[in-house]
């Protein structure tokens, strides 16, 4: 079994760096990377610029471009969507996503398994760039409570009022998908059709999972501890109701990344599990 997992991981590693389509010019050019390098832990301007982030055309509430990066074969049978900084005050989540872009784009190119990675390293730029950084977006909405789970109109407000006691950091918004950032991610799910979604958060130091398949028992030093589902959450919507496995990584610190070696170990563990447990499109 270990041999097969190792082989599968090797296939995914190599596939991440297979020839990819030409990329448009980077979104906002150097100013965006200057802002990210100044705000994020363990992120330099060269690391950000090397990520070759692309303007998706979508905008946040305040008009900031929502950027992404595609790596791998466009016609791959396996598609993985990775998102970071859904909560703007979880700075390390965006940093890890950028480091993983570097790892995904820097592997050998001589293995056949095609994988298409789509990274959205900063889903909530308004929250991230606010002073101080904010969990919510510029409308004060918790994006991870704004996805259209069944009975959202009934359950999400009740959960917010009764369970969180109207915590403003967890306001689900007026309606599902009321926010441009959550609509953007929802559109990515519909158009990209990922077989796996990886959401990077902080600071609880655990690994969560929703949806079909056998969850990973650990990624690096993070062990599986399924914390339950919430109305409007990405895990609830994508994993439970759309049938797309959602791995939620809760880093142990929102303001500091793991060591580079630990980020790489988490990445390799993710690849091994994906190779063993996430089927792509039929060949």
Where are the predicted features?
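A short loop-to-beta-strand scaffold at the N-terminal edge of the catalytic core in hydrolase folds
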Residues: 62-70
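A short acidic-Thr-Gly-centered motif at the start of a beta-strand
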Residues: 71-76
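N-terminal cap/lid segment of alpha/beta-hydrolase-fold proteins
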Residues: 48-62
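C-terminal accessory segments enriched in acidic
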Residues: 1-8, 15-43, 53-55, 67, ...
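Glycine-rich N-terminal segment of FAD-binding domains in flavoprotein oxidoreductases
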Residues: 84
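Active-site/substrate-binding loop(s) of hydrolase catalytic cores
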Residues: 77-81, 91-226
């Amino acid at each position: 079994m270990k041999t097969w997992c190792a082989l599968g991981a090797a296939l995914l590693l190599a596939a991440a760096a297979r020839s990819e389509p030409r990329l448009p010019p980077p979104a906002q050019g150097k100013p965006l990377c200057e802002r990210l390098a100044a705000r994020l832990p363990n992120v330099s301007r060269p690391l950000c610029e090397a990520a070759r982030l692309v303007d998706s055309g979508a905008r946040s509430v305040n008009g900031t471009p929502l950027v992404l990066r595609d790596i791998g074969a466009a016609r791959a049978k396996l598609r993985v969507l990775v998102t970071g900084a859904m909560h703007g005050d979880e700075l390390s989540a965006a940093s890890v996503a950028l480091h993983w872009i570097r790892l995904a784009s820097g592997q050998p190119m001589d293995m056949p398994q095609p994988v298409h990675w789509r990274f959205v390293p900063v889903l909530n730029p308004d929250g991230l760039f606010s002073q101080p950084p904010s969990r919510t977006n510029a409308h004060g909405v918790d994006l991870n409570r704004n996805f259209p789970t069944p009975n959202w109109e009934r359950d999400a407000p009740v959960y917010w009022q009764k369970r969180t006691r109207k915590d403003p950091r967890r306001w689900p918004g007026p309606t599902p998908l009321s926010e441009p950032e959550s609509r953007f991610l929802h559109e990515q799910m519909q158009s990209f059709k990922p077989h796996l979604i990886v959401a990077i958060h902080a600071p609880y130091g655990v690994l969560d999972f929703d949806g079909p398949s056998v969850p990973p028992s650990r990624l690096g030093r993070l062990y599986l501890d399924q914390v339950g589902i919430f109305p409007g959450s990405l895990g609830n919507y994508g994993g439970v109701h759309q049938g797309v496995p959602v791995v939620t990584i809760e880093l142990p610190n929102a303001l500091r990344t793991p060591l580079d070696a630990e980020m790489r170990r988490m990445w390799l563990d993710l690849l091994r599990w994906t190779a063993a447990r996430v089927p792509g499109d039929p060949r």
